C-alpha cells in the first residue's frame, strides 16, 4: 500500500540513491561513540541489540557496562544463575528479554561452541532473537547483507516512501520488509544499518521530526505532502485493560519480607511484594513467624506496562518477626537500608522507599 500513486517510483532520487545518501549522512552526522560501536564481537553486539529493544540508548548504556563488567564473556553469562541475570537487569523492564538472554547464552555455549552463527537466518533461530535483531547482529558482527526493520526504521521508510497503513498490520509489515530488502546497498552494510537506526532515533522522530537536516528531505513523500504527523499510521485504538493487585508490605522495623516471583509473568524471577488481600494479613504474618502489631494502607500506586495499567494497593504491616531467615527459598528478608540500590521492580522499590526509616 505504497501511497501517492506509487511513491517508490515518485521518490525516484530517494529510491535510487537512498542507501548512498544514508551512508554519506551517517559517516558525517551519525552516532559513532556508542560503547557497542567499538567492537565487532558478536557477544557484545548481541547484548546491546537485546537491551536496545523498546529501550532508549541513554537507559541502556549503564546497564550494558554493568553487564560486561559482571559477564565479560558469553561463557560466564551462560554459567551464571538466572537470578543473578535478572537482578542485574532489574529496572530495564521487559524481563522476558533477560530470561531469553540467559537461555540464548546457554544455547550458544552448549550447542555452538560459544560462537554465534554468521547468517541472520541462523541467528534468528536462537532464543529471544527476531528477524530484525538477527539482521543487525549479522550486519554489525559479520558484515552480512541483511535488512533490519525495527520501529524507528518502519517510521523512516513509511514517511520517505509514503507507505500507508499501520506498520504493525501483517500486510503493511510485509510491504515494509520487501521495501527494506530492496534498498540494501551492495557494500558498507554496517554504515547503512547504523544510519537507518540513527536517522530514526535523531531526525525522523515520532513527533517534530527535523526534516530540514534529513538527507532525504527533498525526496521524502511525507515531507513533500506535509504528512509527517500522519505517517506512519497510528495503531488502531483500543482500551488498555486496568488491573489491580493487593500486596502486603511486611516490615519488622529494619527488614521487609519479599517473595521471589515465578519465572513467567510480570517481574518474572525478581523479588517483589507478596500478593495477599488485606483480610489475610494476620494469617500471612503468623505463617511466617511474625506477630502483627499494626497495619496501615498506603496510597495506591499506578504503573503502566505495554499491555495494561496496574494499580498496586499495598497494606503496610508492622510486625514483630522471628530474626531467623525465611524458611522457604522463595521468601527473603531484605534490609530496608539497602532498598535504594537493590535490584527490584521500579514500582516495588517506590513503595519500599516510602516506608523506609529515615
Spans of model-derived segments:
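Intrinsically disordered, low-complexity, charged terminal extensions of DNA damage-control enzymes
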Residues: 1-32, 37-38, 201-358
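Catalytic cores of DNA base-excision repair glycosylases
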Residues: 2, 18-212, 216-229, 240, ...
Amino acid at each position: 500500500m505504497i501511497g501517492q500513486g506509487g511513491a517508490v517510483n515518485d521518490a525516484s532520487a530517494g529510491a535510487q540513491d537512498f542507501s548512498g545518501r544514508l551512508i554519506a549522512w551517517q559517516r558525517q552526522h551519525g552516532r559513532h561513540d556508542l560503547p557497542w560501536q567499538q567492537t565487532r564481537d558478536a557477544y557484545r553486539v548481541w547484548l546491546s541489540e537485546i537491551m536496545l529493544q523498546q529501550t532508549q540508548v541513554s537507559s541502556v548504556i549503564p546497564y550494558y557496562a554493568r553487564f560486561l563488567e559482571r559477564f565479560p564473556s558469553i561463557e560466564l553469562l551462560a554459567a551464571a544463575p538466572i537470578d543473578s541475570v535478572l537482578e542485574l537487569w532489574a529496572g530495564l523492564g521487559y524481563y522476558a528479554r533477560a530470561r531469553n538472554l540467559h537461555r540464548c547464552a546457554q544455547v550458544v555455549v552448549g550447542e555452538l561452541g560459544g560462537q554465534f552463527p554468521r547468517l541472520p537466518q541462523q541467528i534468528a533461530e536462537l532464543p529471544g532473537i527476531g528477524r530484525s535483531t538477527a539482521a543487525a547482529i549479522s550486519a554489525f558482527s559479520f558484515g552480512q547483507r541483511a535488512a533490519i526493520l525495527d520501529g524507528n526504521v518502519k517510521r523512516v521508510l513509511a514517511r520517505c516512501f509514503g507507505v500507508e497503513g499501520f506498520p504493525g498490520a501483517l500486510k503493511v509489515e510485509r510491504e515494509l520488509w520487501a521495501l527494506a530488502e530492496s534498498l540494501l546497498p551492495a557494500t558498507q552494510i554496517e554504515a547503512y544499518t547504523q544510519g537507518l537506526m540513527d536517522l530514526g532515533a535523531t531526525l525522523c522522530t515520532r513527533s517534530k521530526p527535523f526534516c530540514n537536516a534529513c538527507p532525504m528531505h527533498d525526496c521524502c513523500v511525507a515531507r513533500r505532502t506535509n504528512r509527517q504527523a500522519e505517517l506512519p499510521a497510528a495503531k488502531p485504538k483500543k482500551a488498555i485493560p486496568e488491573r489491580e493487585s493487593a500486596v502486603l508490605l511486611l516490615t519488622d522495623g529494619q527488614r521487609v519480607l519479599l517473595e521471589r516471583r515465578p519465572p513467567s509473568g510480570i517481574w518474572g524471577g525478581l523479588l517483589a511484594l507478596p500478593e495477599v488481600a488485606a483480610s489475610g494479613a494476620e494469617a500471612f504474618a503468623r505463617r511466617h513467624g511474625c506477630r502483627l502489631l499494626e497495619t496501615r494502607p498506603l496510597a495506591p500506586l499506578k504503573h503502566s506496562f505495554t499491555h495494561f495499567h496496574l494499580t498496586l494497593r499495598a497494606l503496610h504491616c508492622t510486625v514483630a518477626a522471628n530474626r531467623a531467615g525465611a524458611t522457604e527459598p522463595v521468601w527473603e528478608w531484605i534490609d530496608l537500608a539497602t532498598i535504594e540500590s537493590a535490584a527490584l521492580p521500579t514500582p516495588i522499590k517506590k513503595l519500599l522507599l516510602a516506608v523506609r526509616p529515615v
